[in-house]
Amino acid sequence: MAVDPEVLGDVLGRLRPEVPGIEVDRWAPSVQGAVGQVVGVRDGNGSPYVLKVYPATARRRLDTEVLAQRLLGEVPGIAAPRPVGYGQRNGPAAVGFLLMTRLDGVRWADRRADLDPARTTALTREVGRTLRQLHRVSGQQFGDLLDDGPRRPTAWEHVAARTGELTARYLRTGGPSRLAERIRHFVEDHRRVVAACPGPVLCHNDFVDSNLLVPATGEPRLCGVVDLERASWNDPLSDLAQTRLHVRYHRPADTTALTEGYGVDGPGEHQRLDVHEVLHALAERNWIAYDRPAGWRESVAALDAFLADRT
């Protein structure tokens, strides 16, 4: 749904003292996000920006994205939007808003069909290297990026809590109890390798082709990372596992290029990566069973089969 024109006009008015001459331009994303609505704008000098408008209920998503952009701005070699201005519009049509710099490029997802296998594999390897670079920002505890959010002191406590929440939801959405028990045992059996995580880092939590930018034409190289509203402090291999699950859907053979590009080292790290991928697949299965998009039964069956095979 597009941003209400009256709301958009009011938000632009609030930003104009900081960004003189700001107006809507013709740029628009190929696909809108599930939470925030994105609008292209320019200032009086023609400099391009992106305005993201969030529902009032998503204030934490806004604050998380602002903080994550600032943290990522300290990491060399990664192009990400920088926050320019943000705030909250109260009243009957309350929204949050974030004005950020605009990056060049298009979504990898928009070019995927045009890329040959060799280029796709090379890009996947680069994605692994870039994600490793993002993980240079370290935190203190596992959980919410914002200081007032829920956090846990150890990797194992974080994973154990997540496993409990996900398996309970799995049962509520019709998942077989025998498979839920297998998943719990699988995670418990890998407690030692999970606990070996050296510490939490900044995790994107959606480092996939819809949030990674490449040039619109020519050689596909990673030129931008966007959509940081889900960022958190977590095990870096949890972040990589989510990306690997996504790569597996498109080109299963490229999962090796991804993990090699990232630099997964030794059997312990590979096992830890497997645990996190199982949990991500379980979370996705739960969401599909609850939301029921087109073809949901087939998707649920495929994910149940994957979970059974991996545990």
What are these model-predicted stretches?
Residues 4-23, 88-92, 98, 104, ...:
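An alpha-helical support segment within catalytic cores of ATP-dependent transferases
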Residues 7, 64, 126, 130, ...:
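Charged catalytic carboxylate motif
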Residues 15-24, 76-79, 266:
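Short secondary-structure junctions
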Residues 25-154:
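ATP-binding pocket architecture of kinase catalytic cores
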Residues 30, 59, 125, 161-165, ...:
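Helix-rich C-terminal or lid/interface subdomains of diverse kinases
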Residues 37-42, 83, 185-238:
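Active-site acidic catalytic loop and adjacent metal/ATP-binding pocket
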Residues 43-46, 91-92, 217-219, 278-281:
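Short strand-connecting beta-turns/loops that link adjacent beta-strands
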Residues 52-54, 84-85, 146, 202-205, ...:
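Short beta-strand segments
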